[in-house]
Amino acid sequence: MSSQLTVIIAGIVLVVAIVVALVIMRRGDSRFTYDTQHGTTPRATEGEGNTAVTAFKGRFSILTTGVGAMFAALAVKLWGMQMVSSDYYEKQANSNQTRTVTTSAVRGRILDRNGVALVQNRPSLAVVAYRDLAEDEVLVRHLANVLGMPYVAVLRNIQDNTEGAQSLHTIATDVRRSTVAYIQEHAGEFPGVKIAERTERQYPYGETACHILGYTGTITSEQLEAQNKKTSGDDDASAGKITYQSGDIVGQAGVESYYENLLQGIRGEQTVKVDASGNVTGQAGAVPAKAGSDIKLTLDLKIQQACETALASAIELAKTTGYSNAGNGAVVCLDPNNGEILGMASQPKFDPSVFIGGVSNDVWTELNDDKGSHPLLNRAISGQYMSASTIKPLSALAGLEFGTYTSTQTTNCTGYWTGLGKAWGKRCWLTSGHGTMTLQSGIANSCDPVFYDMGKAFFYDEQHSEGLQEVFRRWGLGKTCGIDLPSEGAGRIPDAEWKESYFTDASAEDRKWNAGDMTNIAIGQGDILVTPLQMACAYMGLANGGKQYVPHVFLSAVSRDGDGDAYKYNGKGKKKRLEAKINSDSDLALVRNGMHDVIYTASTSLAAHFGTLTPQVYGKSGTGEKSGEDEYAWFCAYAPADDPKYVIATVLEQGGGGSDTAMHVVRDVLGVIYDEPDTSSASGDSSVR
């Protein structure tokens, strides 16, 4: 063994040194002269001859004793190495002949609620090498040319210190088979370079559900530091946990990012025997990697595809009916009984496969162009818009609760409202006027003056001057819904405090909250902002009597090494987010009746389209106005009215009137769910906004 040999050599060197020292000392103590006057007997040069001999013998005895002690210690050490610590030194010797490398784990799949794979894995090849390859600049440059990568990038990957000096460092992933073949055929040109089998993400349905699923990419230095802090430790506390290395593939958006801790597997280890040149000569042991868990989502692929198809069709309809700027939009379909997201689409979409192996600069720039449509933005949860008239059912509940508009109160709509004085008059969307309107008919016909009267009453009610905002917030507006996806928007419910702090460049007078501000938010205009998901959650409450469950896309996680569900959403499948206070059953009934009339009474077009569906649908249209842009089309609804199972909320940016274009999204999705396609050819009559 090398350690024993070292000790023996050291002992021999020590003995030789001592012998040399003795010879020198012997020579020094035996220097004699001849006395010519008294014969030829030699005499010591210093002192008497007996004294010199005695001194020499004393020093020799001391050295002999020292040498004996050293040999005794050496013998004890050799005995200990051979008999007591032989296992330790054997392991040390073996470690110099082996290398331990980490092995990657397969990432978990993402499935729909019925087990259909939305994201799966495919085999791929990676180029790997040991760190000492970095010392050969010519080889590194040659490898960079073959891989089509910058020299500095290849060198950086080889020198990376997060994978350990003896680990194989990932240089390139998802390498073309032609490139791999070249490296293998010219192995002599690439000593120390290996080909490793890996897996890459595969999307069987292309762009479907791209905003929910998200995408993966190489871990960034910031992510690497943050992730490994979670599993760092000085003992075995982190054993069996996920650890990350430079070059690892992690979730960067959507479910891939939010549930990274479930999808990511636990890497394994493989110990290989190597020769003096570092070439692998055999296997010495392995700890297998543990695959990540499969995640089952609440999505129903059939409904998801229906949402995407319906949204794209409605946008095309808007373009062909005078709204050429249409192109973006979103739709959410959820279960009002538990908050499960059944379908969610955002337009435009993107192809998540472009991120495999690293996205090019040109593609990344296109996806993030400030002047473009931002395909990576999930408008269903991050897009923030004026709610338009879809908020009027909530305004009605607020008016009924605080008495600012009663069930028997009426408003005479002439098409122009002057409740705040002629100088601050406001138009109704129907400039010819609706005539006498009650609160229920005001909802059905989306009559603006009814809600102007309500907003004015709130403003001048000293006790409940912000009662309208209170109700909006109670129904979940102005704050995130808590969905398990990144980057959810909170929206905005404006009030006096917000206006004072927001318009800092305006005069003190202009920063004051006024009656006009209140009348604006009563009809969903002005500075109010909501997301499609927030409106879907609000209509969830309208459908089930005020209860709102946390919207979520996660259903369960299934360990691929186990035999069942590893984790289910909240244990029982639903978690209440809030329960909006409803003043009375009669108030809710009035609002629901108004939503019924929106579809079946006030609009002949809506009645024609929805009348061919077996279940009754209650809903509300909306048409948002934004300066310098075309109108934004909204439609929110739930069905069946007597036993709600589906809530759908949709918005089309610059897509026209809600009852003209957006309503088709809701109708088409329900048509797929109930297998009752829309057979009506009736065009929008714009009788409801």
Which positions does each model-derived feature cover?
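Beta-lactam-recognizing serine transpeptidase/beta-lactamase-like catalytic domain environment
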Residues: 273-286, 299, 329, 336-390, ...
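Periplasmic/cell-envelope proteins involved in peptidoglycan metabolism and beta-lactam response
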Residues: 1-359, 467-474, 656-689
